[in-house]
Amino acid sequence: MSDPVVRLRELRRSFSQGGVTIDVLRGVNLEIRPGEIVALLGPSGSGKSTMLQAIGLLEGGFSGLIEIAGTDASKLSGDDRTALRRDHLGFVYQFHHLLPDFNAIENVVLPQLVAGTDRAVAEARAAELLSALGLAKRLDHRPSQLSGGEQQRVAVARALANRPEMVLADEPTGNLDEATADRVLEEFLKLVRGEGSAALIATHNERLALRMDRVVRLHEGVLE
């Protein structure tokens, strides 16, 4: 069996609010194998976003093991953590966070240029991903010229642009109507599977969660 692309051991995170300590994550253990798509199910406020931020190495304050592609992130410097995130992880958020002054293809090209990819190669990769998501005729449109579903498709393409081993998605369809959400999720899952990436998709929607390979539930700071 292949080694996990993500391994968590006794992951903990607490916050202080008004002199009270709130334990958000209370010893989370999880392994995700290459190519596996896992739903992280839980209600709003259950700590799903906090857990994704931990795996994504987006903030500190966590205790326990966070291992990405066999590397213990706690032993890395800030620059090395950034490189680990860039080289192995992709991100999709509920709100797309696209650059408003760049068109669709440039939003997908940019992270590849940051990673050192040749522009011609990056443009071909971006066009390939956007076309696979049904946006072949919208490549030169800015985010303001795209529908909500189209914007989120661009965000999906951007997340996969650098061929990450793991995609982290935080309520990726939560800002869309049900019909659009279903279509975007179907296209997202198809593309992730085609790329061979693993994914952890946070959602409060059990109906959508059941379309993943596996469902884990975050309840009172631990996984069930």
From Swiss-Prot:
It is an enzyme of class 7 (translocase). ATP binds at residues 42-49. It is a peripheral membrane protein. GO terms for cellular component: plasma membrane. The keyword Nucleotide-binding applies. Pfam families: ABC_tran. It is found in: Cell inner membrane. GO terms for biological process: lipoprotein localization to outer membrane; protein localization to outer membrane. Its EC number is 7.6.2.-. PROSITE patterns: ABC_TRANSPORTER_1, ABC_TRANSPORTER_2, LOLD. GO terms for molecular function: ATP binding; ATP hydrolysis activity; transmembrane transporter activity. Residues 6-224 form the ABC transporter domain. Keywords: ATP-binding, Cell inner membrane, Cell membrane, Membrane, Nucleotide-binding, Translocase, Transport. The complex is composed of two ATP-binding proteins (LolD) and two transmembrane proteins (LolC and LolE). Part of the ABC transporter complex LolCDE involved in the translocation of mature outer membrane-directed lipoproteins, from the inner membrane to the periplasmic chaperone, LolA. Responsible for the formation of the LolA-lipoprotein complex in an ATP-dependent manner. Belongs to the ABC transporter superfamily. Lipoprotein translocase (TC 3.A.1.125) family. This is Lipoprotein-releasing system ATP-binding protein LolD. The gene is lolD.
